[in-house]
């Protein structure tokens, strides 16, 4: 599990592409501290397993499913990527719950400055927007951000200068693809409330969680 607080921006050193997979080699420093082979590192919001370690970087395998559902396929040597190690049990929870399992890819539709703030508008499909709510959390390329506005085409986030400077947001331009992961809590609630047509409801498998119960509890 991750928190969406980027620890450093790494650089893609090499991409070895296979027929349906790839091996990324990434130059990094901070995320190498206490990292061992087999540990998880989020790369632009995608949970990858460290397969090799070097004094100044690491390698990770990327499978076919990940390439299809993310923007990693468009990376090249020299690309800047956001990096975060998996959260330790005694770590500070600075962002929100981030699984590192990307829901899909959005595209930056607009970037504008408002005094010191930088606004990013991202267009995304309905399968992603259904889980995006105003004032809720969303992960963009591994960055935990708060949704400021949402409509039928996409959503907007307002970022502070520190976030832009410490992530690869300062490299982003209109039209760029970005990895999106919506709040996992909303997905679980939807799953519990959705009728399961594939199997009969019995006392053993029928959920006791209802919409009315959630409303009573303040959701």
Regions found by a protein language model. Give the residues of each.
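Conserved loop->alpha-helix
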Residues: 1-219
């Amino acid at each position: 599990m991750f928190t969406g607080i980027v620890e450093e921006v790494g650089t893609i050193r090499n991409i070895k592409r296979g027929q349906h997979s790839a091996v990324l080699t990434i130059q990094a420093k901070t995320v190498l501290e206490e990292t061992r082979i087999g540990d998880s590192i989020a790369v632009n919001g995608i949970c990858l397993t460290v397969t090799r370690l070097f004094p100044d970087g690491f390698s990770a395998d990327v499978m076919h499913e990940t390439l299809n559902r993310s923007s990693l396929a468009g990376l090249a040597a020299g690309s800047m990527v956001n990096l975060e190690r998996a959260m330790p049990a005694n770590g500070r929870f600075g962002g929100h719950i981030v699984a590192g399992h990307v829901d899909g890819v959005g595209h930056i539709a607009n970037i504008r400055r408002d005094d010191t703030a930088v606004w990013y508008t991202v267009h995304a499909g309905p399968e992603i927007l259904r889980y995006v709510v105003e004032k809720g959390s969303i992960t963009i390329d591994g960055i935990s951000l708060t949704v400021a506005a949402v409509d039928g085409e996409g959503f907007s986030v307002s970022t502070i200068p520190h976030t832009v400077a410490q992530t690869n947001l300062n490299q982003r331009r209109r039209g760029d693809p970005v990895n999106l992961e919506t709040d996992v809590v909303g997905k679980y609630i939807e799953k519990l409330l959705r009728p399961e047509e594939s199997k009969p409801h019995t006392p053993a498998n029928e959920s006791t969680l209802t919409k009315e119960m959630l409303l009573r509890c303040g959701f």
